[in-house]
Amino acid sequence: MQHMTTAQIRQQFLDFFASKQHQVVPSSSLIPGNDATLLFNNAGMVQFKDVFLGAESRPYTRATSSQRCVRAGGKHNDLENVGYTARHHTFFEMLGNFSFGDYFKQDAIKFAWQFLTEEVKLPKEKLLVTIYHDDEEAFNYWSNDIGLPADRIIRIATADNFWSMGDTGPCGPCSEIFYDHGEHIWGGPPGSPEEDGDRFIEIWNLVFMQYNRQNDGTMLPLPKQSVDTGMGLERIAAILQGVHSNYEIDLFKGLIAAAASVTNAQDMDDKSLRVVADHIRSCAFLISDGVMPSNEGRGYVLRRIIRRAVRHGNKLGAQGAFFYKLVAALIEQMGQAYPELAKQQEIIEKVLRIEEEQFGKTLERGLAILEESLSDLKGDVIPGDLVFKLYDTYGFPADLTADVARERQMTIDNKGFEECMAVQRKTAQQAGKFGADYNDQLKSDKQTTYKGYTTTSHSATVVEVFAGSESVSLLEDGQKGIVILDRTPFYAESGGQVGDTGVISVAGGEFTVTNTTKLGNAFAHHGIVQGRIGLNDKVEATIDDARRERIKKNHTATHILHETLRQLLGEHVGQKGSLVQAERLRFDFSHFEAVTKEELREIERVVNDEIRCNFALSTELMAIDDAKAKGAMALFGEKYDDEVRVVTIGDYSIELCGGTHVERAGDIGLFKIVSESGIAAGVRRIEAVTGADAIAYVSEQEQKLNDVAAVVKADSASVLEKVTALLDKSKQLEKQIAQLNDKLASAAGASLLDSVVEINGIKLLIANVKGTESKALRGMVDDLKNKIGSGVIALGVASDDKVSLIAGVTKDLTGRVKAGELVNHMASQVGGKGGGRPDMAQAGGSEPENLTAALDSVTAWFTEKTQA
């Protein structure tokens, strides 16, 4: 058996199949571009799915690859097992060879056996195989061509040895190759009662696609039989390096050593080191492929993996952010095979560090809540509502809580957690419901030809009319409705661009268009009629050209902004949404932190530089594949027709877009950013104005500056210096006022000492401190605690319509009286609630008329509480 590094195995596999006339195909992205049903690329065949289905052709019929895969979230989820078993990973590499109607079973079996026994020299006696129980072809090839004894060819009748792409479509039997680790490890061969043991490990699966399953379950032979194989790189590396666990191979040894270093871990066998070492691989590659941490979809899976790693690092003893420091170690191990890691190192590290720091703020508090709850828990199941509270309040994914439970030999109530989640989702859906849209109620089978790219006015014929949700033949004076034309210059709302407005002129009337939307293949012109308009009328449709020009400026500026963000912030930036109006543009994009003022200034400068370059815009219709080959940016997850419209701005920007644009970039005039904000986890929003609107905005800001200068008696050049000086003076005066209030409160407090009473051997002071600022209450309580030495204090004050309450307990008495309980007793009587530490707690209320009664009730409450 030949000892090889992981990198050597990967290369030798690809070289071997290249020598067998296979095209070496690079790993595709972890984000499947051709399968919306998959969260992540989880097998080598995913990038070839359309080839297998006959929907795509390639210039080769044989291929080989080493495919990056992630299994975490969705149907294929290994997350909870990672670190606790020898072979579960969130990220792994799948070595594979594929035949698209070329060779079939005989050569697939021959190639696999040749690679294992001749190339990497595995002992033949250590190998055995499984076949589907009635696959006589495979049996004969293994027996006659390879020479395997019949007792090492195991027939399996279950679905484990029959693969299918779905309920219908391509399918076929499998043949799996197993390696025997030896009698010293417990376990039996596949198909035996002991098959779940670790002695016999599957290393390679050969799938023979030979049938097409019909809706009725019958299976017809495929016209072109194909082969799909997959071998886990980490598994074969463990065998060739003479170790039993994947975590002992060269690649993981380096990552585990780095993880131990950054977490100060002492025990190199700690399972948490495995978790951290595994998770840095999936997290780094996901970020490299454009996934950002968020609260939904792929981004949430990434967030869960990061948070699980951070929790395990915390468990190992890590102080502060540590996870991002492992990126360098990962690049050292895998950067040669995947140079994109090194290229994006800075971005990957930054995303991980920010996410870790944000979670670190709640991790300690959440763990404390969990520990406290577990100490009071009866039984070995963590309630679903607690799991939900940790998720909702502290950002603990349920699988992180399950991880903690597993370490305590406990489980979580998944059903209860899902019920809580269902309630939350229902509430969110109800909150998000708005009035029904016209278009939700209407259907049209008409087709409108769009003429608006080249003209602002066009003759047309009315082909359909709606009044409300009813199809009618006529709209009469003052009536609102929808008019559908056979041709129109009006752009229908889509791709983030608002619909056009304008007029549709007809003999005997005029239809004022207030919006244009799509209704299937028809364009729906919404508006109100003066006079009349009806079916088959000949009309002239004219858009509001001035408004359209403003929209065009904003749409083209959006394209320039998008490219600028990618150049300045990083290629991880992707469009998450946009709104192109006449008044302004709004652009939502993926980014992991707020854009700084300096970055915004640079973004604005670059966009305006590109505008001044005055590049000509060109549009072209082309095949979607040709557009992507030219580098046209497409929105991920969007469905495009086979033919798409490509908008190019000089040599700066190229995007798929159906919207309207200026003829040259210089037509935009000026671009000015109005605001930048966060709208969701990992999503930022920039709003901006262009052209005359930008000039008006700058003029307005200049006027505001002049107004401020006039107020502070300065000119515009020195206004900042003058305002800064005034703020400094204001802070000094506020500090002096606070000091005076503290002195007044202390003096008032001293006079309260005469009100101290002793109940059950404990001093108690209750007072309504009229006229005292609520901000001064805490200082007053501290001062009183020092003066009385040992005791309990309850103070209240009413101002306007509010009540402020505070309770203080000296440290020696917190075992008998809790400040939080006392302040909440009072707060419940004045329409409020509060909280704090055992020795100091505050509350507010909205019923000042009940303050006296609340304070009067303290004596009885305290007497009962302190009885021995």
Curated annotation (Swiss-Prot):
Q: Which cysteines are joined by disulfide bonds?
A: none
Zinc-finger as a keyword? Answer: no
What reaction(s) does this enzyme catalyze? tRNA(Ala) + L-alanine + ATP = L-alanyl-tRNA(Ala) + AMP + diphosphate
Region annotation Disordered: where it falls in the sequence: 828-847
Any Gene Ontology biological process: alanyl-tRNA aminoacylation
Q: Which GO terms describe its cellular component?
A: cytosol
Entry binding sites for Zn(2+): 555, 559, 657, 661
Entries under PROSITE patterns matching the protein = AA_TRNA_LIGASE_II_ALA (PS50860)
Q: Which cofactor does it need?
A: Zn(2+)
One GO term in the molecular function aspect is: ATP binding
The record's comment on cofactor binding reads: Binds 1 zinc ion per subunit.
Superkingdom: Bacteria
From the Swiss-Prot or TrEMBL record, state where the protein is found: Cytoplasm
Q: Which UniProt keywords apply?
A: Aminoacyl-tRNA synthetase, ATP-binding, Cytoplasm, Ligase, Metal-binding, Nucleotide-binding, Protein biosynthesis, RNA-binding, tRNA-binding, Zinc
Q: What Enzyme Commission number does this protein have?
A: 6.1.1.7
What NCBIfam families does this protein map onto? alaS (TIGR00344)
Q: Which family does it belong to?
A: Belongs to the class-II aminoacyl-tRNA synthetase family.
Q: What does the function comment of this entry state?
A: Catalyzes the attachment of alanine to tRNA(Ala) in a two-step reaction: alanine is first activated by ATP to form Ala-AMP and then transferred to the acceptor end of tRNA(Ala). Also edits incorrectly charged Ser-tRNA(Ala) and Gly-tRNA(Ala) via its editing domain.
Q: What is known of its domains?
A: Consists of three domains; the N-terminal catalytic domain, the editing domain and the C-terminal C-Ala domain. The editing domain removes incorrectly charged amino acids, while the C-Ala domain, along with tRNA(Ala), serves as a bridge to cooperatively bring together the editing and aminoacylation centers thus stimulating deacylation of misacylated tRNAs.
Q: What is this protein called?
A: Alanine--tRNA ligase
Show the taxonomic lineage. Answer: Bacteria, Pseudomonadati, Pseudomonadota, Gammaproteobacteria, Alteromonadales
